Structure formats: structure tokens, C-alpha cells
Regions:
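One face of beta-strands
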Residues: 27, 61-63, 69-71, 88-90, ...
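N-terminal, charged/glycine-rich beta-strand/loop interface patches
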Residues: 1-79, 84, 91
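Acidic (Asp/Glu-rich), glycine- and aromatic
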Residues: 83-91, 96-122
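A structural signal for small-residue-enriched, beta-sheet-centric alpha/beta enzyme cores
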Residues: 108-179
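Solvent-exposed residues in well-ordered beta-strands and their adjoining turns
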Residues: 32-34, 68, 95-97, 131, ...
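Cationic, beta-structured binding surfaces that engage anionic biopolymers and membranes
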Residues: 61-64, 76-82, 89-91, 107-110, ...
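Short beta-strand/loop motifs in extracellular/secreted proteins, especially
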Residues: 37, 100, 126
Length: 179
């Protein structure tokens, strides 16, 4: 495939384990967006966290992104399917220069309800940390278990949810200046 699909925006496809992650797997990805560079980081397909072994050794995916001066990074991976019995940990660490822009999402699907395989056992620990020049701006830690997915105060039985994070350059004025 072409490296540049849209002008100067480079596309980076992370070829994670195509069959998914099992107990004991650990995937660490590090990205540095150089000054003035523009990149879309994505995956060619859904990530998958399969049922853990009986000893519940987790599957861990850790992503570190550093966006330097005047850089732009869109981190838009495909969804992650958390299979019944999975014990996954997803960590995302983002550091953005004061003159850089970051746009990212995470989309999770719990179980395969349509196939008769709901998420009834296991857990997912998801953490997101966003910093500007090393100073923490946002921190989120979630522990999602079947009870959380089903609780009215949780996902109320919905099996899919996503979060979006946008970090604008520090002195960008208004959103329309950037968009």
C-alpha cells in the first residue's frame, strides 16, 4: 500500500499479532512523531484478547506516543474485541509538545454476543495518560468486568464503547483554527 494516502499524512499500519493475544503475550509499541511530521497510526484489523489460561496471566498491550514540535498524530486503531475469559491490560501513554496536535481513540467490544459468546468472565484494565511536555494533563484508569458491562451504572448491557482524546496546540485559539 501507499505510505502517503492524503498529501503529507503518512500512514503507519501496526501489524499486531494477526491471530490476537493470549495469556502471557506482551506487545509494546513506541512511536515518535518528528518535528513537523504528520502521521496516522492505525491497524489493519480488530485487536483480539482471547480467553486467558486458568492462572489468569494477562495479555498486555502498551503504546507510547511522543508528538514533537509542530507534529500531528492521529492514533486511530481498529476496535479491540475482549473475548469471554480474557484478562487484558491496555496501556496508552501520550506526550505532546506544546505546539503539536494529537487525536486518538480507543474502541472496545466485550464478547461476541451475536455469536452466542457474551462476556461473562474476565476483565480488562485500560489506562490512558496524556501529558504535555511531561506534565500530566489527563489520566484515566478503568477496570471493566462483566458486572461493569451489565450494570446500569456501567455500560447497562451495551457491549461496545469508545473514547476520544484530542490535544490541541497550547496557543491554538479556537478549535476551528486547528481543524
Amino acid at each position: 500500500q501507499k505510505l502517503f494516502h492524503d498529501g503529507e499524512l503518512a500512514h503507519c499500519y501496526v501489524l499486531h499479532p494477526p491471530g490476537g493475544m493470549v495469556s502471557g503475550d506482551s506487545l509494546q509499541s513506541r512511536f515518535k512523531v518528528n518535528p513537523g511530521a504528520k502521521v496516522l497510526i492505525t491497524t489493519p484489523a480488530s485487536g483480539k484478547l482471547y480467553q486467558a489460561r486458568q492462572n489468569q496471566i494477562p495479555q498486555i498491550a502498551s503504546t507510547h506516543i511522543d508528538v514533537t514540535s509542530d507534529g500531528f498524530c492521529a492514533h486511530l486503531p481498529q476496535d479491540t474485541i475482549v473475548f469471554d475469559g480474557a484478562f487484558g491490560e491496555l496501556e496508552t501513554f501520550v506526550n505532546v509538545d506544546s505546539r503539536a496536535l494529537f487525536f486518538g481513540w480507543e474502541h472496545l467490544i466485550f464478547g461476541r454476543r451475536a455469536g452466542g459468546h457474551p462476556f461473562e468472565n474476565g476483565q480488562l484494565i485500560q489506562s490512558l495518560r496524556v501529558s504535555r511536555e511531561g506534565r500530566l494533563l489527563f489520566r484515566e484508569n478503568l477496570r471493566l468486568i462483566p458486572q461493569t458491562v451489565n450494570a446500569v451504572s456501567g455500560l447497562n448491557g451495551m457491549v461496545s464503547f469508545a473514547s476520544l482524546t484530542v490535544v490541541l496546540p497550547q496557543n491554538s485559539g479556537t478549535t476551528s483554527d486547528v481543524v
